[in-house]
Amino acid sequence: TVQTETAAETVPPVPTHQTHLDAQYIGQGLLTRPDVQRFISQRVARGGFSRPELEVFFGNVEQKPNIISIMDRPGTSRPWYEFRQNNVSGSRIQNGDRFWRNNVAVIDAVSQRYGVPSELIVAIVGIETNYGSNMGSFRLGDSLTTLAFSYPRRAEFFQKELDQFLQLAHEEKQDMFTFKGSYAGAMGMPQFMPSSYRQWAVDWDGDGHRDIWNNVGDVAASVANYMKQHGWQTGAPMAVPVQLNITPELQALLDAKTELNHTVGDFRRLGVQVPGHVADREKALLYQLEIAPGQ
């Protein structure tokens, strides 16, 4: 299959000892740490926060060493038939049908405005959190701070996300510790990271809040806006079946399945038979769906 949308990043695991270098700090007061003090100073210098305000925040953070253990679990790559069995179950399909029927007016209105199909919006919410039934129960201040300062491998990324989280709490005029999400800091039904929330979340009903936890209009519009701003083309094919003979070069492209660095024309020149209605200029990636063991 040539697929014209990118997939979510899969982060490979690293040896446990790399993440435990800073585990010694868990349990100590965050405000005694030089890196936390440096973060506070930099955040204050950029404006919008006072040092006392941030010291109160870090003084109330509960570090979560179990999050480090979760992040250290070896990553797995599952074939499509296993993913489908686990994530597209009969019960989830029923939940999706109910979610869509209960909210059809607002979802279809969002779809019309953004040009993103209603079924795609519904499917994304279902895969991410099973329609809000699994949004995570960690206080985001706790999870993001733990990862920002006790997970060296991705400290830079999570410090940026922590900074984004602090800003969005101000923007939403909410207590920083009322936000709940996943162990990795993802939020709401669509599981947006704080930076994605600030950039792509939408206040659909104009109530002054971008509530991606409870407000289906905000959820649907945020998903649709994210897709549109990332290049969704209304009416364009998302995936098409192709025929090919595997060569070492094509196998390398299959292995790099999340890299959207080639066009349909590139694949045609490598011998991939793509349906004629797909233009050569379209960016695409080659993806193999294993529908059964060995098939």
What are these regions (language model features)?
Residues G48-F49, V116, V202, W232:
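Helix N-cap/coil-helix junction residues
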Residues G59-E62, G126-T129, Q243-L244:
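Short amphipathic alpha-helical surface patches that mediate protein-protein
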Residues V2-S111:
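An acidic, Gly/Ser/Thr/Pro-rich helix-cap/linker signature
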Residues I40, L166, A224-M227:
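Non-transmembrane alpha-helical segments in soluble domains
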Residues M71-S77, L140-L144, A256-E259:
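Short, structured secondary-structure boundary patches
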Residues R78-S222:
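Acidic/His-rich structured neighborhood in mature extracellular/periplasmic domains
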Residues M176-G294:
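Flexible, glycine-rich surface segments
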